[in-house]
Each structure stands twice: as structure tokens, then as C-alpha cells.
Amino acid sequence: MILPITTYTDEVLHQTAKPLKGVDGAVEELIDSMFESMENASGIGLAAPQVGHSLRLLVLDISCMKSYEDVAPMVVINPHILSVKGKNLMEEGCLSVPGVQGDVQRPSSITLKYRDRNFLEQTEEFSGMLARVLQHEIDHLSGTLFIDRMEKRDRRKIQKELDDIAKGNIEVDYPLARACSRDGGGAICM
């Protein structure tokens, strides 16, 4: 099932996601829906908060990219970055911040401890685009967006686009969720 993507103003994207205690039928269904939603939106990574679920879960598939055709799709549960190496500045975008790109500096390689789709613990080193996509999606699980990592002067340059997204003045080829945030006692949805 294709799920709507939350936009950057949605509260769930600014919260620390909760760890999963296992994989049951509901989580399996969510994983399948996340892959379907990511593919429908022409994305290469998607975190559970981006579809409204505050869970430490992400999926990615970079096999559509040149030089990464042999990289298998991944399910990453409860990730924890153990170590990082190097630095790399690269332009990023995000399904939750449609139409906006910006330069973000990240480590060029990471050692990651996580659980896979079968909830088996894995520890692996990742580099290049795979490391970047993993870090971008893991940020979502901590309530951080790529725009939060941009230099302030660069962020000011995209403020109009961010305002348009907040107002719903955007067109995308995938479903978007209504953004909701808390204000005092009630929810405000835009």
C-alpha cells in the first residue's frame, strides 16, 4: 500500500523515534508499504517517520544508481552508528522536503550496528553513497532533517521554498500527508 509522505513541518519528523522490539506482521506490512511508497515517489531511502510512524526503521534501495546496481535493497531496524571516517560534502534532497536540495557535509564511511528484516543483529561498514543515504535516513530517526545540517547562509537561500512547502504550495507526483504540529493543547494541521 502506498503511504502518504510527511513534509518537513510535521511534528513526527522532529521527534526521536522509538526502537522496535521485534518484527511482527504489522511491521512486515509497514516495511512492504515503505518500499512501495519509496519506489512510487522515486526515492532511494525512506524512514518510518516520513510515513507517520515514530519507529527506528528505514528502508533503502540505491540499485537504480549507476555503480550501485548490485546493491541489494536494505531494511535497517534500530540503527546505531559505531564509528565514522572521513568527510564528504554533497548535495542532498528529501521526499519530505520536496523540490529542495542543499549541500550537506557527512562522514564518508560509517560502521553501523543494526537489525535486519529478520531482526538479526548486523555490524557492517558502509562507504560512498550507501553511507550517505544511511546517515540521511538515520537522521530522520533522531528528528533531524538534511536542511538542519545545511550552513545557515545556504538555508536562508531556500527559505521561500520551505515556506511554500509549509503552506502546501507544492506539486509532487506522490501523495503527501497533511502536516500536523502541536501548539499548546491541540493539534494544528496544515
UniProtKB/Swiss-Prot annotation:
Cofactor(s) the protein requires to work: Fe(2+)
Signal peptide: none
Record keywords, A-Z: Hydrolase, Iron, Metal-binding, Protein biosynthesis
GO MF, any single term: metal ion binding
Binding site for Fe cation: C94, H136, H140
Superkingdom of the organism of origin: Bacteria
Pfam families per the UniProt record, alphabetical: Pep_deformylase (PF01327)
Entry keyword rRNA-binding: no
Reaction equations catalysed: N-terminal N-formyl-L-methionyl-[peptide] + H2O = N-terminal L-methionyl-[peptide] + formate
GO biological process: co-translational protein modification; translation
SUPFAM superfamilies: Peptide deformylase
E.C. no: 3.5.1.88
EC class of the enzyme, as a word: hydrolase
Job of this protein: Removes the formyl group from the N-terminal Met of newly synthesized proteins. Requires at least a dipeptide for an efficient rate of reaction. N-terminal L-methionine is a prerequisite for activity but the enzyme has broad specificity at other positions.
Similarity remark: Belongs to the polypeptide deformylase family.
NCBIfam families named in the record: pept_deformyl (TIGR00079), PRK00150.1-3 (NF001159)
Protein name in the entry: Peptide deformylase
Originating organism: Chlorobium phaeovibrioides (strain DSM 265 / 1930)
